[in-house]
């Protein structure tokens, strides 16, 4: 009976992974690569184009769904730290499969001060290697002012997430400056 239970559990887990389009970190855009350019509509039905942000540091984070507890915590953390991001010339972009209407509702309810993009066709999620069948994986790409991905985060606790991201940017900036001086 125990073996039957374990076998069924393993089959269910494997089926879920296959159906969800499970992606491993090896599928993500690699550190050191140029961030793929894309265009998507934001919550206000305005087109966001990554090429318009050339020369800016970027946080591009993919999240599963609007109104989920995890994303609410993550988004509100970015909202609360937004002025620090702006002082450091860093733009924040959130992306999910949700439709614009849902993104707009979520943004208004939580008073978000950054753009949230709708990738309902899953095209950008595929470009960045975070696509799954049901929703994109929770992954954050940190991009320098040259458009190069310098960090990929998929395992950080959501507590103080936005503050920790700022520290990663500051550390990268110090390391980049040291490399220039050498």
Name these PLM-found stretches.
Residues 62-80, 84:
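Conserved redox-active cysteine motifs that mediate thiol-disulfide chemistry
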Residues 91-93, 104-138:
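Short, internal strand/loop/helix patches
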